């Protein structure tokens, strides 16, 4: 990591923070202003397995025999939360950075646009984490209100729980969804 990289020139440094280290000096750090929670499966694991062998690797070593391996296969909808501290986007006191309101807004819009392409590579497979349901707003309190509040039961999204959370927030909240994903789509709308 180049210690000369600043939030002014690198949006990823601005949004996701950094730890700049130099030999014989204290580290300079910036906490992430955009935070993505862990992705949690909304559907149970059903025990699907893919059976593999290591034949290719074993063939490269004389005397080594191939082994069978099991890999879990899980297709599910996932819930994750993105929170962004809008007061800190484009502002970095460590490096004296203070971007214009227009540039700060652009960074947030760019981040939100990137989320539609979110995926996760794990154990040789790619998980599509592009949103099929989004809920949120601009809130005074910097709290991940919907973290662990998205629940799915037999294809139905728990709308009653979401309504309760929205009532407690008492600030405008918007949601959107892709057609054909949830059984209770009309209720969600």
PLM region spans:
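RNA-binding basic/glycine-rich loop and surface signature characteristic of RAMP-family CRISPR effectors
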Residues: 1-189
